[in-house]
């Protein structure tokens, strides 16, 4: 058994570095959206109207079903919520 260390859980469980990076970005966005909804005490129905999605879709978001959301969808919802997204790109070590 190897004692390999990973910088992120996504590095450990995803098959490729590309998939891991995608999941890292998606998890940051999903968490930001969940925090926004919790902080504003907005109902799922209200959020659905703002995000332009269905209430069950917001429920999936709140339950952390990350596999159901692509980057585009999460970016669109965050922007609709008035959140500003910044991205930083670094060269691999």
Language model regions located:
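N-terminal flexible/basic segments that precede or flank functional cores
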Residues: 1-32
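Generic structural marker for isolated residues within well-ordered, non-membrane alpha-helices
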Residues: 33, 44, 74
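Short amphipathic helical patch at the helix-1/turn junction of helix-turn-helix
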Residues: 37-39
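Short alpha-helical DNA-recognition segment
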Residues: 42-57
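DNA major-groove recognition helix of helix-turn-helix
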Residues: 62
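DNA major-groove recognition helix of helix-turn-helix/homeodomain DNA-binding modules
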Residues: 71-87
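Short, charged recognition helix plus adjacent turn
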Residues: 89-93
């Amino acid at each position: 058994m190897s004692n390999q260390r990973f910088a992120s859980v996504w590095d450990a469980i995803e098959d490729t570095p590309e998939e891991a990076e995608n999941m890292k970005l998606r998890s940051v966005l999903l968490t930001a959206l969940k925090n926004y909804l919790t902080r504003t005490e907005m109902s799922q129905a209200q959020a659905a109207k703002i995000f332009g999605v269905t209430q069950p879709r917001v429920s999936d978001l709140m339950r952390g079903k990350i596999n159901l959301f692509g980057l585009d969808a999460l970016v669109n919802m965050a922007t609709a919520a008035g959140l500003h997204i910044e991205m930083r790109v670094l060269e691999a070590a």
